[in-house]
Amino acid sequence: SEKKGIGKMEHCKIIAVGDNVCDKYLSRGKMYPGGQCVNTCVYVKMNNMESAYLGKYGDDEVAACVQDTLKEIGIDDSHCRRYEGENGFALVTLKETDRVFLGSNKGGIAKEHDFGFTKEDLEYIKGFHLFTQI
């Protein structure tokens, strides 16, 4: 008989708490969402497991890009904080096939606000098998 616990990996639920950004590719005029926590959630979901993201968003088009992408992929971000101001971003260009980072806004609004976890947040987090914070 199977031991109690996580069981098969496809039933594993992971929540990542922390950063989200968009890389703004100046050479292409496009934005691509990312950040270690968002990337972790996406890779988990790509492997047919459940993932959720808990972080801080600004109220600009960069935040909308991340939120829309997570929604499209099916990653829950319902417990994220939303603040007035710029979401985190990095400015990127390409030199031949290499990415060159030109600068960033150092996380935008995320650096200005603590998480201030609520009891509801903590209960929500308890529903996951793995918690990662970056």
Residue locations for each model-derived region?
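Glycine-rich phosphate/adenosyl-contacting loop at the front of the ribokinase-like
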Residues: 5-75
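Structural motif
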Residues: 15-17, 129-132
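Conserved N-terminal subdomain of the carbohydrate kinase-like
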Residues: 22-24, 50-130
